[in-house]
């Protein structure tokens, strides 16, 4: 999952709605930090698994479990979902993203994408954030 860029080579690195589609999202985040110049910005935004859109086209059935939701989708529609749980869609939590960002020492901000600013406090409440933050934005500034 190495990005094809040299270390410290870009001013801004953005990943929007990709992390939930790779098996190792924090490796992706690490690569983003590697290629971002010190003082630059890395922005990683992803759909939170337990949020209302975590199952993507499977809708809220992902609350039944990823494999079960995928099987139900295939039965109902006669073909597998485009985002196949376990191979092209993975359960990524808000807690894991916040923990990873904090561990880098580069975290600047974390907030829920698509929410008004007054609702940004939701990211600070464990459990609640997993269900009410549909998409988490992590902003990092490498040193």
Describe the predicted segments one by one.
Residues 2-7:
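Short conserved loop adjoining the S-adenosyl-L-methionine
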Residues 14:
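A conserved beta-strand element that flanks and buttresses the S-adenosyl-L-methionine
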Residues 17-21:
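A short His-aromatic
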Residues 23-31, 37, 41-141:
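S-adenosyl-L-methionine-dependent methyltransferase catalytic module, highlighting the catalytic core
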């Amino acid at each position: 999952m190495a990005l094809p860029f040299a270390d410290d080579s870009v001013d801004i690195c953005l990943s929007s709605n990709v992390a939930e589609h790779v098996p190792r999202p924090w490796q992706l985040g690490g690569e983003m930090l590697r290629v971002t110049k010190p003082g630059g910005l890395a922005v990683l935004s992803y759909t939170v698994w337990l949020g209302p859109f975590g199952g993507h086209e499977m809708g809220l059935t992902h609350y039944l479990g990823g494999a079960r939701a995928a099987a139900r989708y295939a039965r109902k529609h006669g073909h597998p979902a485009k985002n196949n749980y376990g191979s092209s869609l993975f359960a990524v939590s808000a807690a894991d993203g916040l923990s990873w960002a904090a561990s880098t020492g580069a975290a600047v901000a974390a907030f829920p994408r698509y929410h008004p600013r007054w609702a940004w406090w939701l990211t600070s409440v464990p459990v609640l954030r997993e269900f009410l933050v549909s998409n988490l934005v992590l902003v990092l500034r490498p040193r």
